[in-house]
């Protein structure tokens, strides 16, 4: 048996240099990630998210898809900044717009968005969402597909498009709510299309329809765009038995 004297003891007072993470500057403000300053925010990951977003330019491009009806002389929070705030909040788990009553004062959120003051309030973000219409949705999906294409350094030989319809449960009297027997709840039935880990389409729909509805039209549009970029790429449609519809099968056979 090892004696108490011989047992090693941890040195709890030893200083460990964990280094410093340097982020992009905001004006004259130097932004660093350190581990010796105490608990300043519970959402520090938003800084990394902001850096990745700026490198991709995703929300910068998405903001150009949303028409701003406001007078330029009266704008305090731009569309790009509000979109960043909303999307970053969702990524952090803050889904409710009311959460931004507190988040707008969070220094980490402000810095990630790219401002040095309070970001937009919940009512302002609500108005942003109201500006989006069907044309906005089409433009946003074009951004997703263009980002997907830009992610390839070489021409792919094969692409597998995964189609799936799933439930989005509802807990109130939202417009377009219907009871879905399979999911045994009131829900929406969005249609998603992925290629690997990348999202190509997210189409919000009522649940009173066939889960495969719209799939043929979306498949046709995606294949057309992808083959504009890569004429020889092999494209595979993949879905569960719910997508075994004659219209989809016939189109796939014609398109090759």
Regions from the PLM with identified roles:
Residues 1-210, 214-231:
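Dynamic "connector" segments at or just before major functional cores
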Residues 249-256:
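Short, surface-exposed basic-aromatic patches at helix termini and helix-loop junctions that form
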């Amino acid at each position: 048996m090892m004696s108490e004297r011989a047992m090693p003891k941890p040195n709890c007072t030893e200083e460990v240099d964990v280094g410093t993470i340097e982020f992009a500057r905001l004006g004259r403000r130097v932004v660093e990630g350190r581990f010796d300053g105490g608990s300043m925010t519970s959402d520090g990951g938003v800084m990394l998210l902001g850096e990745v977003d700026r490198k991709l330019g995703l929300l910068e491009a998405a903001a150009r898809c949303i028409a701003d009806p406001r007078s330029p002389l009266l704008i305090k929070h731009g569309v790009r900044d509000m979109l960043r705030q909303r999307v970053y909040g969702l990524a952090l788990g803050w889904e409710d717009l009311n959460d931004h009553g507190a988040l707008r004062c969070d220094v980490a959120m402000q810095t990630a968005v790219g401002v040095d003051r309070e970001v937009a309030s919940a009512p302002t973000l609500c108005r942003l969402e109201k500006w989006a219409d069907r044309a906005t949705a089409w433009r946003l999906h074009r951004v997703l597909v263009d980002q997907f294409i830009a992610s390839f350094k070489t021409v792919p030989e094969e692409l597998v498009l995964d189609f799936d319809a799933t439930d989005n449960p509802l807990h109130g009297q939202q417009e377009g709510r219907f009871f879905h027997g399979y999911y045994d709840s009131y829900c929406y039935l969005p249609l998603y299309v992925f290629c690997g880990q990348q999202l190509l389409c997210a189409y919000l729909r009522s649940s009173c329809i066939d889960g495969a509805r719209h799939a043929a039209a979306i498949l046709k549009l995606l294949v057309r765009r992808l083959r504009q970029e890569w004429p020889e790429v092999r494209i595979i449609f993949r879905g569960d038995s719910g997508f075994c519809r004659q219209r989809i099968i016939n189109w796939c056979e014609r398109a090759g």
